[in-house]
């Protein structure tokens, strides 16, 4: 997409948004100075209730159309406390244009919004709809976003848990497979889910990005003849590795500063990359550095229940690997047999049963909470 076309699209559609086939103008979404609410807020508050997902959409649009050039977003908090960031609306539109251009979305295409609006992923679905003139289909965030739909959207962004759940219900699976442009982010895609996606007739993509990059700056194809383990960055994104082999991102159209991530990565000869894990998810046990994500990937095929790997301090080894298992009862003998198949330094030294694994609001493993759960358990024993 050339710059003149980009400018044209932005100016043409930024002042209107289509929701469930009904067009709303910026003036209707903007807060009135007289009563502190927009016409859209009043309508959605009355129809759906002040605490509804539709009302949160009206609140976001009121913020989008206010006089400020920035708005506040929150990180997911997967590795610690969520952070507040102020981001430029102009750069959010730049991010939207990257995705619209890459996927070749067109005015009038439907876009399902099934992500929480307090985080960047949900906000960017709305911004893409504004910029490209998409028909936004709001679905309150849940584990089965397809369950009440009669026709599939043209475009949707989902987390792995939503995709997995939808695949388990035949009617939802049928609709899911008809989505023409499906992007999946917010968590790892395991081998079983990746295999199931191979049957999809349309392109399915895994995204790489974060709040600081205003959603994704790279995609990798999950199905078809072009499927790959490697992410391809957008054209205006420059990537490199730090001395610690963590990914450094230079993407001036969406992020003003050089971004140093905690993601340990490697490149291939084509400039594509893949993520090996996070620096803050490295466990140093007995002088050997173990990557949590790699242990979890190996255990996926060995354990048939939800689990997480975490660690606790250990006076002998520095850190001790701990396995958290979500189950009513656990078969220690069976689990120990599975653990023996791991390399020696990868093997958890302790197994803890819990009722529910800690997740963030966006469905990511809450690593900080997992460590706290393990530490509290150890302290009590």
Regions picked out by a protein language model, each given a short descriptive name:
Residues 88-94, 110-165:
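AMP-binding/adenylate-forming
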